[in-house]
């Protein structure tokens, strides 16, 4: 059956798996311990008002974002909303491009590729005609976790 708000209020400890959203957990007002490690969760804001939540395990989070990114005029743009527990959008800490043919990883200079809104622009000038995995890495120092999300850049 369905879980009631009353049942949510009884939760003290919870381990979550195979989740993409924390929606509904805002009703677990007595939650003290939560383990959401290894999930594809991008928004932790439903936890914002859980005052008793002192044990949060969220390291790491991440996954593959469906769909492909295509370059236009030698520029590929990627925007992803990763929201921390306080409802604040996190900016990527690093952007890594992998060449699928050579298996080389290239970490881009954050200052050159991210604007103030967190939109990542990758200059594809000089890229081979190939598929490139793009890794966006986020870090929340307050709750001590990192998130890594992967996009596929289609430069064919």
Task: Set out the residue ranges of the language-model regions.
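Short beta-strand elements
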Residues: 141-156
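Canonical position 11/12 of the leucine-rich repeat
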Residues: 18-22, 39-44, 61-65
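Solvent-exposed, low-complexity, repeat-rich "mucin-like" stalks and linkers
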Residues: 61-101
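Hydrophobic anchor residues at the C-terminal helix/turn of individual leucine-rich repeat
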Residues: 5, 25-28, 47-50
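Acidic, glycine-rich calcium-binding repeat modules characteristic of RTX/beta-roll
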Residues: 35-48, 53-57
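Conserved hydrophobic beta-strand positions in leucine-rich repeat
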Residues: 11-16, 32-36, 56-59
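Conserved hydrophobic position(s) of the canonical leucine-rich repeat
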Residues: 11, 31, 50-53, 64
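LRR flanking "cap" motifs
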Residues: 1-24, 92-94, 99-128, 134
């Amino acid at each position: 059956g369905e879980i009631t708000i009353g049942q949510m209020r009884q939760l003290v400890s919870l381990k979550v798996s195979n989740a993409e959203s924390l929606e509904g957990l805002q009703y677990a007002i007595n939650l003290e311990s939560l383990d959401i490690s290894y999930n594809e969760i991008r928004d932790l804001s439903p936890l914002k008002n859980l005052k008793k939540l002192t044990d949060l395990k969220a390291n790491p989070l991440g996954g593959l974002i469906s769909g492909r990114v295509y370059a236009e005029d030698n520029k590929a743009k990627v925007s992803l909303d990763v929201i921390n527990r306080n409802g604040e959008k996190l900016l990527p800490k690093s952007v890594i491009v992998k060449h699928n043919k050579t298996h080389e990883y290239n970490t881009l200079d954050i200052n050159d590729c991210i604007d103030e809104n967190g939109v990542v622009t990758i200059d594809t000038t000089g890229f081979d005609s190939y598929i490139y995995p793009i890794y966006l890495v986020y870090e929340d120092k307050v709750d001590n976790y990192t998130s890594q999300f992967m996009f596929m850049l289609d430069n064919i």
